[in-house]
Amino acid sequence: MPRKRLRAVLFGPQGSGKGTQGRMLADYFGVPLIGSGELFRAEIQEKTALGKLVKSYVGRGALVPDELVNAVVQKQLKAIAVDRGFLLDGYPRNVEQAESLDKVVKINLALQIKIGDDESLRRLLGRRQCTGCKTIFHI
């Protein structure tokens, strides 16, 4: 019987370490880590139709609507071999997004990282980004 591949979602508040833990889990299981933020940046940089729509919201500091978030994530899921597995970082964020995802692929694991509000705030206040290379680091 073939081994079931990881098709998982990773949840947690900002500063909880989703990105760090997600990279380690994705490496361990040999699956791609898919984060909506990275997908948004790629779509914007490539100047796709979706990217232009995303930029219109991100540029003014507005939340990207669920329909658009779903379209960006589903585009990526269609581009990879989902039967080989994947790990979604921070998506879905609500019931509408979860229902949309469920129509495309079945998730077999959900992981939640819990962290206190004070610790989350401490970590976020210590987060910095290099203006040149865009690397995020902590002080």
Q: Model-predicted segments: where are they?
A:
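Glycine-rich phosphate-binding loop of ATP-dependent small-molecule kinases
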Residues: 1-139
